[in-house]
Design a protein with these regions (language model features):
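Non-catalytic, surface beta->alpha helical segment in thiol-disulfide oxidoreductase systems
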Residues: 126, 132-161
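Bacterial Sec-dependent N-terminal signal peptides
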Residues: 1-13
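Short Fe-S-cluster ligation motifs
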Residues: 111-125
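N-terminal leader/targeting and pre-domain segments
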Residues: 10-66
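Conserved redox-active cysteine motifs that mediate thiol-disulfide chemistry
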Residues: 77-85
Length: 161
């Protein structure tokens, strides 16, 4: 799924958003970029305040135990839904003990593109988009906002496999 050239890419690059004239992350990113001075004002409070449903987490933990699960996330640091859902997602995976090495995070501009075109083949229309893969085959997406909650929607995707 993830081409080898990504390992050589610079992480957490920023550029100026033309509409807001503010810095936004672009391209391949990770949690460190989201927790940097530019973006921690929304990441930390949302991460800390999100209340996880522990019953669903227990079921999720069982669902991912023996899987080859990987997740690609496409988000915009300029996007309110991304600012809300991405910290919640990280709290969920931290609670699950899910390895960040199985997560690829791309930040896009308002056209839903990166400068290097990494997301061009993913058919992104709204952000954030969480794409779940089992053994490199797409098994489901959460687009923009969850239907119920992130952890419930994740469980629903994994339960259909």
């Amino acid at each position: 799924i993830i081409p080898l050239f990504l390992e050589a890419q610079e992480l957490n690059k920023t550029k100026i958003d033309e509409r807001s004239q503010m810095e936004v992350l672009t391209g391949l990113c990770n949690r460190d970029g989201l927790k940097s001075d530019l973006f921690k004002s929304y990441f930390e409070p949302e991460y800390q305040s999100y209340q996880i449903n522990n019953l669903i987490i227990d079921s999720l933990r069982k669902s991912i135990k023996n899987t080859d699960l990987s997740i690609v996330i496409v988000m915009g640091t300029w996007c309110g839904d991304s600012q809300e859902q991405i910290p919640r997602f990280y709290k969920i995976i931290d609670t699950l003990g899910f390895s960040e090495s199985n997560i690829t995070l791309y930040c896009v501009d308002r056209t839903k593109k990166t400068d290097q075109g990494e997301t061009n083949e993913l058919s992104i229309t709204f952000v954030p988009t969480f794409i779940f893969y089992e053994k490199e085959k797409e098994i489901g997406r959460i687009i923009e906002s969850p239907k119920i909650s992130l952890e419930r929607d994740m469980l629903d995707i994994l339960s259909t496999q």
